[in-house]
Design a protein with these regions (language model features):
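Active-site catalytic microenvironments for nucleophilic, acid-base chemistry
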Residues: 107-115, 159-164
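Active-site scaffold of zinc-dependent metalloenzymes
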Residues: 57-95, 104-111
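Active-site metal-coordination segments of metallo-dependent hydrolases
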Residues: 139-154
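Pan-zinc metallopeptidase signature
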Residues: 155-288
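Short acidic, low-complexity intrinsically disordered linear motifs used
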Residues: 2-16
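A conserved beta-strand element that flanks and buttresses the S-adenosyl-L-methionine
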Residues: 100
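Post-HEXXH active-site segment of zinc metalloproteases
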Residues: 94, 110-142
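Amphipathic, interaction-prone secondary-structure segments
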Residues: 38-65
Length: 288
């Protein structure tokens, strides 16, 4: 049993880059998982105040996906959290670890949240689930992708995915663009408010929209006609596009940080090797 009472808030939820503890976890996870047959892998990990059980299973649709029970974590904060990960047969171990880190970031955030504003992203997640109805699900899925904790968790997948690969920065960027980390932003960018409004019967859309406004937008102004609906979803189309621009920059920043670190590490290695060579030459001169 882990005592959560005295957890130190190392970083705020607003910190978008991967925290140092998650970098360490990703490296240790890869080392451990590499020792075993990955499909069917199961193990429990404890890192400081984070405790989780990992189960890796074969996906039935040839893709990577994972899940955790966020509500259970909130209700029972002292439990070890179950992370179930589904992977394809032709998996990339780095992306497997990245998928796990996505969920670990959620756990980390729940245990280190220190403001109501930080909580809103998770609260909205709970509210939107009941609005997955018919074609309205298309909008709700985009809202889910746009939640702050989801954007951060996807961004935190970049370090474990490309950090240990022997690639240059451009090729790493191209690789990230081929994943859901980047494609999720393309989905947000593709939202067309007119097409969406026309895809749902007006009275049904009014009802669902006003529930969304009350529970998620927390706005007193309800939609009363089709013009209101068009304006409301036009604003969301603009909002999604602004998020896309913002988070594509975040992806670039995250990749650049990784390569700055690699350059620094390489320079340290070169300097260390040169120093050792000078010592060896000096010893040979003095003692021979």
């Amino acid at each position: 049993m882990i005592n959560r009472k005295f957890i130190k808030h190392f970083e705020s939820f607003s910190e978008r880059s991967i925290p140092e503890i998650l970098k360490k976890i990703s490296i240790e996870l890869k080392d451990d998982i590499s020792k075993y047959s990955i499909i069917g892998y199961s193990n429990t990990f404890e890192f400081e105040y984070l405790s989780f059980n990992i189960d890796i299973k074969l996906s039935n649709n040839g893709s990577y996906y994972s899940n955790i029970d966020l509500l259970k974590i909130i209700k029972e904060p002292d439990i070890s959290v179950d992370i179930v990960v589904y992977i394809p047969n032709n998996f990339d171990i780095d992306y497997v670890v990245a998928t796990i880190i996505h969920e670990v970031r959620h756990i980390y955030d729940i245990y280190t949240i220190n403001s109501e504003n930080d909580m809103k992203s998770f609260v909205d997640d709970f509210y939107i689930r009941k609005l997955k109805i018919g074609n309205y699900t298309n909008f709700i899925n985009l809202i889910y992708l746009s939640l702050e904790h989801e954007l951060i968790a996807r961004n935190n997948m970049i370090f474990p995915y490309i950090g240990s690969k022997n690639m240059n920065e451009k090729d790493s960027m191209d690789l990230v663009k081929s994943t859901f980390i980047y494609k999720s932003l393309d989905l947000l960018d593709s939202f067309d408010h007119i097409s969406f409004v026309n895809s749902i019967e007006p009275n049904t859309l009014l009802k669902l929209t006003n529930i969304f406004i009350k529970d998620v937008s927390k706005d007193n102004k309800q939609c009363i006609n089709i013009d209101d609906l068009i304006l409301f979803y036009q604003k969301y189309e603009e909002y999604f596009k602004s998020l896309v621009s913002e988070w594509k920059l975040e992806i670039n920043k995250e990749i650049s940080k990784i390569y700055e670190l690699k350059t620094y590490s390489n320079n340290e290695s070169i300097i260390g090797g040169t120093h050792r060579l000078f010592i060896e030459i000096y010893n040979n001169i003095i003692y021979t």
